[in-house]
Amino acid sequence: MATGFKLPELAPVKSAWGPPETEQIGGDIPYAPFSKGDRLGKIADWSVDQPKDGREQRGRQGAFAGRFRDQYQTYGYGASSIFGYQHSEDESSFSVIDRGSVNRTRTSARNGGTLLKVRGRGQNVQRGGRGGRYGSSGGRGAGDTVVSRSSGAGGARGRRFGWKDYDKHQRLRNASVTVGDDWQLLDEVEFSHLSKLNLAAAAPVTVDSYGYIYPYDKSFDKIHVKSEKPLQALDRVHYNPTTTEDPVIQKLALNSDANIFITDSILSLLMCSTRSVYPWDIVITHQSGKLFFDKREGGPFDYLTVNENAYDSPMDADNREGVNSPGALSVEATYINQNFCVQALRETEEEKYKLPHPNPFYNSKEQSEPLAAHGYIYRDVDLSLETDEKPVKLMVRTEVDGYVKNPANDVQYISIKALNEYDPKFTNVTGSVDWRSKLESQRGAVFATEMKNNSCKLARWTVEALLAGVDSMKVGFVSRSNARDAQHHGILGVVAYKPADLASQMNLSLSNGWGIVRTIADVCLKMPDGKYVLVKDPNRPILRLYSVPPNTFEEAAGPSLEASSTA
């Protein structure tokens, strides 16, 4: 039986012209965006499994991206994912597992590190209080030390910017001093501006000399790698007081016409500040038209840096007690320098060379420890310009370590320093070479690499030698006897340089250094009397000058000049 046919009802026609109005049917259905790039070849594809979640999808893309080109995509994925629904697993039972404490026993050169538990001899580093005494000894301290050794390849994995950049730590250092809430920022300057300064200063003039020194043992010049000489741990007291705690500077501040007082370690850092990478700070006191540049007790000026300018400088490991952390390497380098300086001298009473005055920091009646031989020479430098209304003179305390005699039997001052190698396995990271295998045949290349990795430290040593007026610098190469033992070292060789020649090789400009010092002094002399702190930014090449309350660092401050003048 044929079904009936019925015409649909037509909308009433209001006018006799035009089509009828369309009824609003389906107006509440949301619009699904689409793209012409969507694959529309199949209505439904039941042969490809939908990925469970994002983690599985990323894993498949990483492992099979080259084999399976077509990935699962929801219709409309090319334009928007608002209406594309992807099923995900229930993550209510998901939990994070901490795997940071898992010890990996097998490692490779590209992955991870190894935790080694070694028993070493602890060094005894003593720092005095207000007198500025800094002593070191080779004492033994028992104790187990967990050492974290890594070639730097166990870092975080991420986007690859360059060769092995994926495993390098981000170098974020902490400031040497915490900026207080009551500190006021006065000025800041970038290193690019400091490097353009220039001032031709007069040659330093000796004002007075204190202490005594011994002759240099020339047998150290004959040391070779095959005839390695062990570094001895000698108990000697070393003094490195800050400026305002120096009784000689206190006397000169009252009687001389100098208006800037500073020590050679602080002055050399200011003159070489554009080469510095690690953070540091200097306390500046402006009092009655005179400036005093001080260091904080136990601060960066009491220790030496290691590979500060290297491309991959030492970083703080997870275990900060490791022997290759920056702090441990700094203490080790200071310990090596002090012992090498004492061992390289012939300590005989007949050959002792006494300066006009005794050591101003040592009192034999109150202290019984043996004193390290040092000569303290106070020198005056004229930094005045023709346009200055008042002369600007700088008084600096310099140091000499020993002496040699020329063919005319005249005494010539020398400076004795030491470079240290802490782990030959890090040579591929820092760009250096193994000293024990290359020092004999490529001594020039070894020293050139050290000038690159320790540019700031060597530049400071050169400036200190030029300020003291020494004739020669003796630089020793000291390496660990065992890469895991930071207490036993061997002397592999000694090289001698003229300070002026070394400055020329390092492209070190004294006129630029004097320009930096004069610029900072001019800024501080224009400020009212008070205390200021010059801070090197820990992560950027910037110097900042802060005004601080008078009682800042008061626990480390020495006697004031007014008190010394009335005493």
UniProtKB/Swiss-Prot annotation:
The family line of this record is: Belongs to the eIF-3 subunit D family.
Q: What does this protein do?
A: mRNA cap-binding component of the eukaryotic translation initiation factor 3 (eIF-3) complex, which is involved in protein synthesis of a specialized repertoire of mRNAs and, together with other initiation factors, stimulates binding of mRNA and methionyl-tRNAi to the 40S ribosome. The eIF-3 complex specifically targets and initiates translation of a subset of mRNAs involved in cell proliferation. In the eIF-3 complex, eif3d specifically recognizes and binds the 7-methylguanosine cap of a subset of mRNAs.
Look up the record and report any one GO term of the cellular component aspect: eukaryotic translation initiation factor 3 complex, eIF3e
Q: Where located?
A: Cytoplasm
InterPro entries hit by this protein: eIF3d
HAMAP family from the UniProt entry: eIF3d
Q: Does the keyword RNA-binding apply?
A: yes
Q: Which domain of life is it from?
A: Eukaryota
Q: Cite the residue spans of the region called Disordered.
A: 12-34, 122-160
* Gene Ontology biological process terms, A to Z: cap-dependent translational initiation; formation of cytoplasmic translation initiation complex; translational initiation
**Gene disruption: observed consequences:** Reduced rate of protein synthesis, although the polyribosome content is not affected. Enhanced sensitivity to caffeine and defective spore formation.
Span of the secretion signal? none
- Chain positions covered by the region annotation RNA gate: 300-314
Q: Which UniProt keywords apply?
A: Cytoplasm, Initiation factor, Protein biosynthesis, RNA-binding
Q: Where is the composition biased (Gly residues)?
A: 128-142
Give this protein's Gene Ontology molecular function annotations. Answer: mRNA cap binding; translation initiation factor activity
Protein name, per record: Eukaryotic translation initiation factor 3 subunit D
What is the UniProt domain comment for this protein?
The RNA gate region regulates mRNA cap recognition to prevent promiscuous mRNA-binding before assembly of eif3d into the full eukaryotic translation initiation factor 3 (eIF-3) complex.
